[in-house]
Each structure stands twice: as C-alpha cells, then as structure tokens.
Swiss-Prot record:
HAMAP family attached to this UniProt entry: Endoribonucl_YbeY
The protein's name in its UniProt record: Endoribonuclease YbeY
EC number, as in UniProt: 3.1.-.-
Record lineage: Bacteria, Pseudomonadati, Pseudomonadota, Gammaproteobacteria, Cellvibrionales
GO molecular function, one term: metalloendopeptidase activity
Amino acid sequence: MLTIDIQQASTADASQLPSDKQFEIWVEAALQQRMNEAELSIRIVDEDESQALNLQYRGKDKSTNVLSFPCELPDGVELPLLGDLVICAQVVAKEALEQGKLLHAHWAHMVVHGTLHLLGYDHIEDGEAEEMEAIEIQVLLELGYPNPY
C-alpha cells in the first residue's frame, strides 16, 4: 500500500500543478518491483524554501528542482517510511520551458527521479548515473512520457 502526504506550500497556480492522483501514479511507477509498501511526503514549495533547504542540506545557495530526504530509521525499527521529497514548482516550470519539455512530463520526471533517490539510487558516479537514468527512462516510457535526457 502506498501512502503519500502531499503538502502544497507554493504560491504557484494550482492549475499548473499535478493532481494528488498523478503524484500517486508516478510514485507507484517508480516503486514498481522495488518496494511494495511505502509512506512518503511530497512538499511543493517556492524558490525561497527550496533555496534555504538546498543551502542547509547540500551547501548550495540556489533553488533546485527536487530535494530528496530518505528516512533513516533506527536499527530494529521496520516501518515502510520512505522519506520526503521537496519539489520547487517554479524551478520545475522554468526547466520545462528552457528544455522544451511538456510541464506534465517534467513533473513526472522529477517525481520519479526523487523517488529513486529515496530508494537509494544516486548519480554521483558515472556508473550509478547510467543505472539511475536507465530506470528513469524506462519508468517514464511505461507511463507514456518521452526520454527526459
């Protein structure tokens, strides 16, 4: 079972944001065959909150598209808590425009990308990046979206 707590903390036009159901579809697709039960939060924020979190946790003083905060449970505690995603609506919209992507498709990519980070995937090393990108491409193609790269 999938439980998603969606927090809308952005001033972005709600008509430009995905529906709760769409977030659920994208997360389920990323989790497919990787995790059967999960709880996570998705917080939609403005650039100021994204920038503050990016500075605090990554040392980068700029807003970013998605931040992933995996849940770190103590040993012996077995709960399906995956973690939190913080997605900046303005950055996602700006990137979609700059990259010539449909806004909906870029949102899907950011949710899948962030969810894979929560599962432990990363793109720091070339080999890890190739693996993660291949999974993203496959998941997005299965959802009917084009290759985001």
